[in-house]
Amino acid sequence: MAKKILLVDDAAFMRKMIKDTLSKNGYTELFEAVDGADAVEKFGEIGPDLVIMDITMPNMDGLEALKAIRAKDSGANVVMCSAMGQESMVMDAVRSGAKDYIVKPFK
């Protein structure tokens, strides 16, 4: 069975770049959300195996969305992906339930 991955970023070019990279590596069940509120809604609908989510977004930021997702599913696999690489931000994300943290830009 294919793994379902939810990509969450308000920047369409970033979602496309990650989606293209994952597609080239055999992932086919890829879904997109444009902000944290959209991510929480789609998480409930899709039940993804993995969420890759930005932090700085309109309507609901990634940390708020992470907490809402973890409230729905305490075992949710959420990886934060942000340009904010300060140690304090990484620690906030991990304390909020992120499984990992990727700093942008990346190759």
Language-model segments: which ranges?
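Short, conserved "switch-loop" micro-motifs in signal-transduction and mechanochemical regulators
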Residues: 84-85
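Active-site beta3 strand of CheY-like receiver
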Residues: 46-52
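Acidic catalytic/metal-coordinating carboxylates
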Residues: 35-38, 61-64
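A Lys-centered signature of the CheY-like receiver
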Residues: 104
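Two-component/phosphorelay signaling modules centered on CheY-like receiver
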Residues: 12-31
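Receiver (REC) domain active-site loop signature in two-component systems and cognate sites
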Residues: 57
